[in-house]
Amino acid sequence: MASRQMTNDHLRLSWHDTQMMATLSPQTVMDYFCRKSNPFYDHMCNNETVRMQRLGPEHLHNMIGLEYILLHVAEPILYVIRKQHRHNPSEATPIADYYIIGGTVYKAPDLANVINSRILNTVVNLQSAFEEASSYARYHPNKGYTWDFSSNKVFSDRSKSDKKDANSAKDENSGTLFQKQRVDMLLAELLRKFPPPIPPMLQNLQQPPPAGDDLNTARNASEMNNATGPLDIKTEGVDMKPPPEKKSK
């Protein structure tokens, strides 16, 4: 389990050395890979022993244990290095492969990681396809299940759900029936205690108009006044004497 976790961590790593990137060649690529700062390089391998003893790479075939070899070259960009365990000069078991592209070292994924990644992508795509297909399925009691691929159907369902959410939010923000009635009662009480002033123009409009004969009389009087002008009313003196009383014979 720990080795599997370490392998997955190495798949996310990359390494490069800017000092030697420009001078890579089939003769120098192994020295570039075997630098101590490379996290993919195991310092307990046979390559390190050969380097410390200043021997040539051909001596690796006569040794037993872990070693790194140059497997494939595609100059000047790609180099493939294999990590393997040598049992004898003619037999070795591959452990891992590393590739160098443009001076950057990566670990190549093994077959299990490739299969797991492909299966995961397939499952995710199938799940999204089933979810998309289920959104077009419709059920009717008489017809059963049918497909409805009208483009507006899904959008209309989404708009309806959005409207329902908006209405529910409005209902939550509005007050209860008791609160509304209570506010109306308080407003009516305040209006009764503090009535607003009525303008004079509205007071004249509120006076009842003259009824029937009084209205006609008022109209005739106004017409006569307009036609003849103002009338002079003569008044008699207040000192007039009453007629003498008749005496009985």
Curated annotation (Swiss-Prot):
Domain of life: Eukaryota
Record GO terms (molecular function): transcription coregulator activity
Compositional bias ranges of the Basic and acidic residues kind: 156-173, 233-249
Keywords: Activator, Nucleus, Transcription, Transcription regulation
Swiss-Prot/TrEMBL GO biological process terms: defense response to Gram-negative bacterium; negative regulation of innate immune response; positive regulation of DNA-templated transcription; regulation of transcription by RNA polymerase II
Pfam families (UniProt xref): Med6 (PF04934)
UniProt subcellular location: Nucleus
GO CC annotation: core mediator complex; cytoplasm; mediator complex; nucleoplasm; nucleus
Biased composition (Polar residues): 217-228
Ranges where the record places region Disordered: 156-177, 198-249
Xref: Gene3D superfamilies: Mediator complex, subunit Med6 (3.10.450.580)
Family as reported in the entry's similarity comment: Belongs to the Mediator complex subunit 6 family.
Function: Component of the Mediator complex, a coactivator involved in the regulated transcription of nearly all RNA polymerase II-dependent genes. Mediator functions as a bridge to convey information from gene-specific regulatory proteins to the basal RNA polymerase II transcription machinery. Mediator is recruited to promoters by direct interactions with regulatory proteins and serves as a scaffold for the assembly of a functional preinitiation complex with RNA polymerase II and the general transcription factors. Required for activated transcription of the MtnA, MtnB and MtnD genes.
Summary of subunit composition and partner proteins: Component of the Mediator complex, which includes at least MED4, MED6, MED14, MED17, MED18, MED20, MED21, MED23, MED24, MED27, MED30 and MED31.
Protein name, UniProt field: Mediator of RNA polymerase II transcription subunit 6
Native source organism of the sequence: Drosophila melanogaster
